[in-house]
């Protein structure tokens, strides 16, 4: 009798995989094991919950029971997997174990919290569960410090500002979105955040946090300090690799997989935020969707390589939204920036005048799909 496929995780990657498997095979045994409730929610919504007045439970789209019934699944929520015996094809928790034919790691990534004194006072918003734990504090907070000016930090800064809170955003870099694009491109959004009232502390460093009678005292470099009611870490994600490491799989930044999503063990695969595909960690929805389609085929006996096209990344800052694609972080590109009242188109070209990247904003985002077609594969 077939032991079927065991998936560790229940987030977007795991669910996309389940849907793609069931399109092709209605009966192969599918078992999902995860530490959370396994209820479905849309993770990008976490960047907008405060301005929209949503509670954690409002985010639930489908309960675990409904999910299991719809797709004929064996679910084990609130279950921590402790070990994988790759040789015996067994997954273990404290009180249970599961035999598998094929195993998929979809363990996601955890929010990185800067290792400063008082780091335990920092909140993270990387899951519905994390939001549920801190939603009262965030709703009641009047003064909010966001640590990190990347994609999530910028989205959160705008959202909290739209909710009427006093927002300070701190980052080591000289501009927001510094790992994604040069300052001359991000300056439009940076200016908009400042106009809205976000206090930007760039080229600045958080040195420690301390609880006070009236809030949290954040100590910064250059003998500065600020008192706030809540501090949110938005300093990036770290792929969850501990389980894979204990199983003896090859690890770099994430769980290393090839173009077939296969790890260094023939019967173990990785998908989503935890996976490093041919040296790249791609924690965005579109590559995860495409990876899930390919992996479903391969788990069912095909041999299909993943081929990723040029893809859009969306920065969901409603007052000034951005779409970007290509190698926007490349240092050697020349940027041709066309700015109008209704939006911006920034083109990054190489020495041969070949388009390598672009960023578009506001009403000019409709030009993204035409530009996308001209990017090299």
UniProtKB/Swiss-Prot annotation:
Keywords: Cytoplasm, FAD, Flavoprotein, NAD, Oxidoreductase. Its EC number is 1.18.1.-. One of its GO terms (cellular component) is cytoplasm. Its cofactor is FAD. Its main location: cytoplasm. GO terms for molecular function: oxidoreductase activity, acting on iron-sulfur proteins as donors, NAD or NADP as acceptor. Gene3D superfamilies: 3.30.390.120, FAD/NAD(P)-binding domain. Belongs to the FAD-dependent oxidoreductase family. This is Nitric oxide reductase FlRd-NAD(+) reductase.
């Amino acid at each position: 009798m077939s032991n079927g496929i065991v998936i560790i995780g229940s987030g977007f990657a795991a669910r996309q995989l389940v849907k793609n498997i069931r399109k092709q095979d209605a009966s192969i045994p599918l078992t999902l094991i995860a530490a959370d409730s396994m209820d479905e929610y849309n993770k990008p919504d976490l960047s907008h919950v405060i301005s929209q007045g949503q509670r954690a439970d409002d985010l639930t789209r489908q309960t675990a029971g409904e999910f299991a019934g719809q797709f004929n699944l064996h679910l084990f929520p609130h279950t921590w997997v402790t070990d994988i015996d790759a040789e015996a094809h067994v997954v273990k928790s404290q009180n249970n174990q599961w035999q598998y034919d094929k195993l998929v790691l979809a363990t996601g990534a955890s929010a990185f919290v800067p290792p400063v004194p008082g780091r335990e006072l920092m909140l993270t918003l990387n899951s519905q569960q994390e939001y549920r734990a801190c939603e009262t504090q965030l709703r009641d907070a009047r003064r909010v410090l966001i640590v990190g000016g990347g994609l999530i930090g910028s989205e959160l800064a705008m959202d909290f500002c739209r909710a009427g809170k006093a927002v300070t955003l701190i980052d080591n870099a000289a501009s927001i979105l510094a790992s994604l694009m040069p300052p001359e491109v991000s300056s439009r959004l940076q200016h908009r955040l400042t106009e809205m009232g976000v206090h930007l502390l760039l080229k600045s460093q958080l040195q420690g946090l301390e609880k006070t009678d009236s809030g949290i005292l954040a100590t910064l470099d250059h003998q500065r300090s600020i008192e706030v009611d809540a501090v949110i870490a938005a300093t990036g994600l770290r792929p969850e690799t501990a389980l894979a490491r204990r199983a003896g799989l090859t690890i770099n930044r994430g769980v290393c997989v090839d173009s077939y999503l296969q790890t260094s063990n023939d019967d173990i695969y990785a998908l989503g935020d935890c996976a490093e595909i041919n040296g790249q960690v791609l924690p965005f929805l579109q590559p995860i969707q495409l990876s899930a389609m390919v992996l479903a085929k391969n788990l069912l006996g095909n041999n299909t390589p993943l081929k990723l096209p040029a893809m859009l990344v969306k920065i969901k800052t409603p007052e000034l939204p951005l779409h970007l694609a290509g190698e926007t972080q490349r240092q050697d590109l020349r940027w041709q920036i066309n700015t109008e009242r209704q939006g911006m188109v920034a083109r990054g070209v190489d020495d041969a005048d070949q388009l390598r990247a672009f960023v578009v904003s506001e009403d000019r985002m409709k030009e993204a799909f035409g530009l996308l077609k001209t990017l090299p594969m």
